[in-house]
């Protein structure tokens, strides 16, 4: 693949979910509606949006967990929906809904993942403590069962697991949700290091505007499944004649992050 070719190429990607209401009627909601964008190797792109905007659906589609209803997506030249096994070897995903063996410890979960990725015992024994330390996971709790850890602690283990193989494309779905300020800063620092040391391409889906502005080269805004823009933050501010991303969100959507959501928004959140 040419170095000038996109790392991620999404064209008119759509996903519609149905939800039964009553005995017969099904309500259909578009979690994504004709979304298109590209990413270059080594780039970090942040997708902003409220809950239910379609961010998680986008991540699930690119990580081969869902099939699209329309459109195409390619990761380093491979068709996400026709060549899922090739794509899976290039992608690691961190999500707020990360699953673990709850009775096993953080170290045991990572060791299991390492074996799955084909890492040998010596490399596993060396790498796991280093990664856990880098994401700010305390050494005193590495042997503790996952079910006894807070959501924030589990999120750190999810990030560590995704970084075991130095992924080419890292899909981060709210990676710092549930973390205290210090842990959040540690994870953000580690994301920067991974990007620059391993030339990883990063898609960061978040509702944290400050996080997006600090970490990303370009910022996109998903609202009710529509990608309203995706461009450098200064271009976004200039486009709308504003000084902050929050003002840009208001200018683009006519509402603020704090506005009450409609029934349609709440129903869309079930899917997106």
Where on the chain are the PLM-derived regions?
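Conserved ABC ATPase signature
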Residues: 145-149
């Amino acid at each position: 693949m040419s170095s000038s070719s996109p790392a991620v190429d999404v064209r008119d990607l759509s996903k519609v979910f149905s939800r039964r209401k009553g005995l017969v009627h099904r309500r259909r909601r578009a979690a994504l509606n004709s979304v298109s964008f590209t990413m270059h190797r080594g780039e970090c792109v942040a997708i902003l949006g409220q809950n239910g905007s379609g961010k998680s659906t986008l991540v699930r589609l690119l990580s081969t967990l869902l099939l699209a209803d329309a459109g195409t997506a390619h990761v380093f030249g491979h068709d996400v929906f026709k060549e899922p096994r090739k794509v899976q070897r290039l992608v690691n995903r961190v999500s707020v809904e990360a699953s673990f063996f709850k009775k096993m410890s953080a170290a045991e979960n990572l060791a299991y993942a390492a074996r799955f990725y084909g890492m040998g015992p010596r490399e596993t024994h060396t790498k796991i403590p280093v990664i856990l330390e880098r994401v700010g996971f305390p050494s005193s709790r590495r042997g503790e069962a996952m079910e006894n850890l807070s959501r924030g602690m589990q999120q750190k283990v999810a990030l560590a697991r995704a970084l075991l193989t130095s992924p080419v494309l890292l899909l981060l779905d709210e990676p710092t949700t549930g973390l205290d300020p210090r842990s959040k800063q540690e994870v953000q620092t580690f994301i920067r290091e991974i990007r620059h040391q391993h030339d990883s391409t990063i898609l960061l889906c978040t509702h944290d505007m400050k996080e997006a502005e600090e970490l990303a080269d370009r910022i996109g805004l998903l609202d009710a499944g529509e990608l309203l823009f995706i461009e450098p933050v200064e271009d976004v501010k200039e486009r709308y004649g504003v000084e902050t991303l929050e003002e840009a969100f208001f200018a683009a959507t006519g509402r603020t992050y704090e506005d009450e959501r409609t029934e349609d928004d709440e129903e869309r959140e079930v899917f997106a």
